[in-house]
Design a protein with these regions (language model features):
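Globular "head" domains of long coiled-coil molecular machines
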Residues: 1-215
């Protein structure tokens, strides 16, 4: 909902409890809608909207070698929710694909905070994800319990208690637990996101993307 602004015409990233995001994808506000990808040697290339929509983990699994040619995607469009904010969607820690995990590890600490989203209906915490986050993450951790409108509050309380105990027992510090759903006010998720201060000292990944976005904005402003 942050990305779509509750507008059904906005292209969305694939969403599932399974690993669906194929390649780290940066989403940011811009003067116009644009899709690009950046190669491992930092060469920027334009991408059509139709191609962007077709890229999924399933597709890349079928076309071997393509994912190694793309460092990350950048999607920009007009969105007041993204003023001063960029969201990085990653393949995730809970993927069974070792390459997905490596991609996530490579970029995760370039962000100011990690928002770990749990489906309230899943009911479990992935142990391998906990191990990787504990070992690799050195940024603030927030837990988002999503789809809370699909269960009674008493059940949501139990899920949060289970997640909290599991992470605490594993030695993971959680800055805040956030409950969210399709019916909740967008501010319920935007407020904690915007409260996160910049913590990165060497934001090379972020700086590269911001430079790309500034160049794109100037290009459109001059035309």
């Amino acid at each position: 909902r942050i990305l779509s602004q509750d507008d059904k015409t906005i292209p969305l990233l694939p969403v599932s409890t399974k690993a669906t995001t194929a390649i780290p994808t940066y989403i940011a506000g811009g003067v116009s809608t644009a899709y690009r990808f950046v190669t491992p040697d930092n060469v920027e290339k334009n991408l059509s909207e139709s191609t962007f929509k077709k890229v999924s983990k399933e597709v890349l699994d079928q076309v071997k070698g393509v994912s190694s040619l793309i460092k990350y995607f950048v999607m920009t469009y007009k969105n007041p929710n993204l003023d001063g904010l960029s969201i990085l969607d990653t393949p995730g820690f809970n993927s069974n694909d070792s390459e997905d995990k490596e991609r996530t590890i490579e970029v995760i600490n370039e962000c100011d905070a990690l928002f770990w989203v749990f489906d309230v209906n899943a009911g479990t915490v992935n142990r391998s994800s906990i191990s990787l986050i504990k070992e690799k993450l050195n940024k603030p951790l927030y837990v988002v319990i999503n789809k809370v409108d699909t269960k009674p509050k008493s059940e949501v309380d139990k899920v949060e208690a289970l997640i909290s105990k599991t992470l605490k027992d594993a030695g993971l510090k959680v800055e805040k637990y956030i409950r969210f759903s399709a019916k909740a006010p967008l501010e319920d998720i935007m407020a904690p996101i915007k409260s996160v201060g910049s913590t990165s000292e060497n934001d090379t990944f972020v700086e590269d993307v911001q430079t790309d976005l500034e160049g794109l904005s100037k290009k459109y402003e001059s035309t």
